[in-house]
């Protein structure tokens, strides 16, 4: 029998951009200076007015794909947890716990690659469309109220994103 993982939702928290900037500063403090990275706040916590799980998503875009492993290893050496489940050969996913709770999810990808552009453009397009924010919020709230599993919640979100953001430039 599969254990049903639950999830919590929060209204937009104005401290999330500050939390992102602080975490970005921490990450930059230990990454080798020779590695060219672009670190951006992604996901619903980057969109004012969006309901989201209270976990800040961060994309680290690496200019040279050969540096993906170095960045991953640097994060690991500084307490970030590698997720083999969400990772692939060109997209590493890591988490950071604060007070025992995952507060940050880090996506290490090729800068300006397809995945990086999808994540960055999702935020950009959502920020500029209040009716779409409402529709996305309604979906998440409905799933939460129906006590959907975290797996089903994630699946429904990905489907919504695919339907509404099929063109990534």
Model-derived features: positions:
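Short amphipathic alpha-helices in soluble, non-transmembrane regions
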Residues: 70-78
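Conserved catalytic core of two-metal-ion nucleotidyltransferases
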Residues: 80-114
């Amino acid at each position: 029998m599969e254990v049903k993982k639950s999830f919590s939702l929060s209204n937009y928290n104005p401290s999330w951009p500050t939390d992102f900037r602080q975490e970005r500063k921490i990450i930059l403090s230990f990454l080798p200076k020779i590695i060219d990275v672009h670190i951006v706040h992604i996901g619903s916590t980057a969109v004012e007015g969006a309901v989201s799980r209270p976990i800040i998503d961060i994309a680290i875009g690496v200019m040279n794909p050969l540096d993906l492993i170095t960045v991953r290893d640097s994060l690991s050496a500084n307490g970030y947890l590698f997720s083999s489940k969400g990772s692939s050969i060109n997209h590493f996913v890591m988490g950071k716990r604060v007070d025992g709770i995952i507060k940050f999810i880090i996506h290490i990808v090729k800068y300006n690659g397809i995945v990086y552009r999808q994540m960055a453009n999702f935020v950009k397009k959502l920020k500029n469309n209040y009716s779409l924010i409402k529709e996305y919020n309604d979906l998440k709230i409905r799933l939460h109220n129906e006590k959907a599993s975290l797996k089903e919640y994630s699946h429904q979100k990905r489907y919504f994103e695919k339907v509404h953001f099929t063109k990534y430039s």
